[in-house]
Amino acid sequence: MTQPWILGLTGGIGSGKSAAAEHFISLGVHLVDADHAARWVVEPGRPALAKIVERFGDGILLPDGQLDRAALRERIFQAPEERRWLEQLLHPLIGAEIVQYLARAESPYAILVSPLLVESGQRQMTHRVLVVDTPEHLQLQRTMLRDKVSEEQVRSILQAQARRDERLKHADDVLVNDGDLSHLQREVERLHAFYLTLRGGRA
């Protein structure tokens, strides 16, 4: 069997990237979520967690031994050098985890979904990039509704993510998600049919 090629799927908060990912899964495409990989590498018993505790102390653990993400975020928020240390520890481990899960794919192509595909350098692991793009007013509206957060909070998250034009610059394909769910699903099906004709992510 030929090795599946890898599609990078990304989009800003509230763009509909998760809904698109779910529909690709329903069509039988193997998908790896970078956010999940980031959680797996710091599970109890994994070497990364021991190193984090060694550096920051037991205060960043929950009573059940899991990583207290909020406490860790607080520790690194005002300390760029600590954040860099953490990134240097975790990024290679997350990358290795992603590669391992992508290797299990049995579909003609596999998807790596990541909100930080462009910023983290994870797009180097892909053959093609699909950006789910949404007008900013819809991103704000959807995220405020879904996460019950203020417009200010959503705007601060948007600022931390790659700028829309930066993401689009790296896109091979763009799915404009400015309609309802059935519109999004039709677009995913259209792209899926096209992707099945590709070899190595190229026509």
Curated annotation (Swiss-Prot):
Gene Ontology CC entries for this record: cytoplasm
EC number: 2.7.1.24
Keywords: ATP-binding, Coenzyme A biosynthesis, Cytoplasm, Kinase, Nucleotide-binding, Transferase
Record's keyword annotation contains Repressor: no
Binding locations of ATP: 14-19
An MF annotation (GO) of this entry: ATP binding
Intrachain disulfide bonds: none
Enzyme class: transferase
Chain segments annotated as transmembrane: none
InterPro entries xref list: Depp_CoAkinase, P-loop_NTPase
BP GO annotations: coenzyme A biosynthetic process
Main location: cytoplasm
DPCK domain ranges (all copies): 6-203
Biological or metabolic pathway of the protein: Cofactor biosynthesis; coenzyme A biosynthesis; CoA from (R)-pantothenate: step 5/5
Reaction(s) catalysed by this chain's protein: 3'-dephospho-CoA + ATP = ADP + CoA + H(+)
Subcellular locations according to the entry: Cytoplasm
Free-text function comment from the UniProt entry: Catalyzes the phosphorylation of the 3'-hydroxyl group of dephosphocoenzyme A to form coenzyme A.
Similarity field: Belongs to the CoaE family.
HAMAP family reported in the protein's UniProt record: Dephospho_CoA_kinase
This protein's name: Dephospho-CoA kinase
Source organism: Pseudomonas aeruginosa (strain ATCC 15692 / DSM 22644 / CIP 104116 / JCM 14847 / LMG 12228 / 1C / PRS 101 / PAO1)
Source species taxonomy: Bacteria, Pseudomonadati, Pseudomonadota, Gammaproteobacteria, Pseudomonadales
